[in-house]
Swiss-Prot record:
InterPro entries cross-referenced by the UniProt entry: P-loop_NTPase (IPR027417), Replication_origin-bd (IPR003450)
Record's protein name: Putative replication origin binding protein
Organism superkingdom: Viruses
Disulfide bonds: none
Conditions for induction: Expressed in the early phase of the viral replicative cycle.
Motif range (DEAD box): 484-487
Keywords: ATP-binding, DNA-binding, Early protein, Nucleotide-binding
Function per UniProt: Displays bipolar ssDNA and dsDNA unwinding activities that require the same core catalytic residues for unwinding in either direction, the 3'-5' direction being more robust.
Residues annotated as binding ATP: A399, S400, L401, G402, T403, G404, K405, T406
Record family assignment: Belongs to the herpesviridae oribp family.
GO biological process, one term: DNA replication
Gene from which the chain derives: obp
A Pfam short name: Herpes_ori_bp
Domain spans labelled Helicase ATP-binding: 386-516
Amino acid sequence: MFSILQGHAGFSRDLATGIWREIKAEDYTFAKRFSKEHPEGKPASMPFKFDVIEEHDPQSLAEMLPLMRRLTSDPHIVAVRGRCLAPKNNVRRKKGNFNVSNPSNIIAMDVDGILDTGGYDKFNLVGMARHIIKMLNSISEDMFPLDAGFIAHASSSAGLKPGIRMHLMLESNVKVTQGQLKFLFTSINDSSKQKFGFDIADLAYYSSVQLHYFADPLFSDGIVDPFKAESKPRLVYVKGSKVNLPNNLVDYETTRGEFKEEFYSLLDQIKGKKIASDKVEETISELEEADDGVYLRIIPKLYHRALEDGVDFAWLEREIKPALSEYIATKDNSRNIQDYFNNGRKQALKAFVNNSKREIPLNLKGVPLKKLEVDSPPEVPYLKINIVPPKGHITFVKASLGTGKTTAVTKWLDAGVLPGNFLAVTNTRALVSSNAKKFSAGQYDKSVDMLNFKRGAIDRMSTTIHSLHKFKSFIGQIDTIFIDECDAVMNDLLFAPVVKQRRECIQVLRDILMTAKTVILSDGDISAETIEAYGSLIDFDKPVAFYNHHRKMLSKAHAYEFPDESSIWVALQTSLEMGEKSILVSDCGPDELNEKGMALRRNTGALVKEIHSNSTSDVDIRRILDYTTNELIDQQIDCLLCSPSVTSGVDFNYFDNVFVITRTSNQAPNMRFQAIRRDRGAQNIYYFIDKSTSGFSAGSEQYNIDEGWLELAQQLYARRRELESRNYTSTLRYYLLDQGATIDIFSESWGTIEGAGKEYTEERIKAILHSTPDYCAPRHADAYEAKLLLVRYYHLESIKDVTVEHVEQYIKDKPNDRAAFFHKMHEMFWEDIKKCSNVTIKPFIEALKGKKKDFFLKTGQSANPKYARMYLGMMGIGKDMNTENIVDWYRTYCKIECMPIPFKFMTEEERAMAEEVMSELGATNEDA
């Protein structure tokens, strides 16, 4: 459906003079005008109001052709896709006035600035149109036949600027809406960027009530239309086949989410800052100086930034009221100030929720998903499913954290409704052990259990995803597979370095998913990407069903967001002084947790213990991890300071408060939310998130989905990670609000606690100095290993030569950590690093931009180039760009890890010897 519009005739007030001026319909020109005054072309008119003069619904290209002839030849009319719902005179171009969901057989594309013309002359519209169709065919030959018919129209700058610049009309076999076309061409553009390096279609064409400017440009002052000068037509029609689109294309808006009135209630749960951030100040200034675009552009941006930065909306509205009132009085008297406030809140909330929420659609890119109902009454928080999931399906169980997903599976097993061999898969060893206990199952890492499973003495097993290849011989014998934490399992399968035999694990997973009678996948973080990754692994050969059990498990909880890390430690110390029980989860690292634990014990007298990679072998810590709440009671613990990786999957119900510090974006926001839920009963949550966490880059645009399932699934997860981490803090806030918590956002620091840096450094030095093969001090399990590494890196004769100074230097330099990171980097970046200097590191930055995907896959860290200097530091390379130390350390690292030293890091003597050996091998090969 095309509505044909002309500008509405009437009076317009000149803002400078206050004089009203009459404007006729023909005064509005919807063609670009080229003249001496505007050699680059004066843009087309943009009236505030229109008259709808005609409506057309062409069913074919043949019917579209006369309409195109009219639209291209009359500069005073313009088109909109959609049927007008309002009175046709004096109508504003907004979504509510037009039904934009009318399906049509006509596909309109705006192709703008593609430099690859296929070798055709810039006036050869037929050749260039066929070249576009050829590119579309290379992306999907089923949808876009090479002999597709088309109408091609030269856009205003065609012939004047390089590249393909045209409006291209195709005819579809089925009727589709603009929203469906936006979804289609979003996917087409993703493939096009990977294949050709550019977008094929301009997606703005498919926005609601977007003006379609078809009028040919106007030329004056001796400037000649280049097409007329060449005697070439600006409009051509070629008959041919139809485009073959699937009849179940989803609408783009359904993939982006919609606004719901219930979103407004989220604002009641937030108490924001009464101070503007820099971004909010900048947008307020833009508002104060604006002549137009305030309602649709500036206000939504202002509210979106305010919500992201935690600024209180009521305070913001008081601040902007004077400027907005003046704008309404002088430039837009058709709306009142509350309309602006409501639109800002609505647009900000829509983006806030839909950029963060993980939803399961009923139709996933054409694949229908069947929603199953749970048996839990609305007032009951815990998950109850009376009937076992259907056989022959892949069934996802999405339920809020702490509602009993694994308990439901345990009940099915106990009831005997999951007969035969049962395999539970998860992503951490701690959860393997936990699931083994819950399901009365054997463990993959116990030989006797594997043997008993093989001979049929037991029929239940628990394993990690990285050990799934061990079950290759059991393919066809597994009756039920249960994947616990399935979203995290898939993430590990795609990216985690711990999965050494990745492709074999993928193949075994695929075969078990195909052959198992019952497939159950459970997680609180399931999204469309989760389902697509698992479903596409088996080409959706099994129907997909899902349960969605959402409960507000934090409805009585209060969260407090702090502006800096030091405030968290002050709040934690205060809670201990008040006699409260507290747990802190932080990515600070073992040494900092140990130092803070020492300070808190000294400052408060509380019993504080640290759980991290260097303490899990300590007896007291091991018992806490194994026996959780009961052991905390027995040890009378006041406070735990924990690393998130060590406590993943370990749940407590003991503490009054949870504290969370997030310095880096190495873990996604949903994993930090799981850290917040480490204690299921805590009602006070204190958190700090460093600003550097936002803007995570996983190089999603650099994956080649034509390579197969692995790259397709990696791209799905990488793109979701980037979206959710675009504003890390905002996403985490949504998770808290969604679970019912209230949030107070503080703008002022609470100060600092008295640290124990000096005392802890002395303790760490003593721990390394006095360590032996049989003894390491508590919380310093790596001390003897550090001592041995120190000897190697500083080229000492033996551990007897280690001095306090050596240990101090080792603690400062961290040579093994630097070399280990350098090992991941040097193949990709060494040549670029060598080009850097103390003046610029641009060569490294540019290289990082081009290898984002590879960097993320190697390191698991953000490939955002803004961290380039930090990554050089992590390689032991300072601002002086001196690489002598890291080369020496890396050579030592290779020897420690029994790896050959790369040729580029060899000494002259080593190179000569290596070349000699290679020469001898070559001679031997020739002789053979």
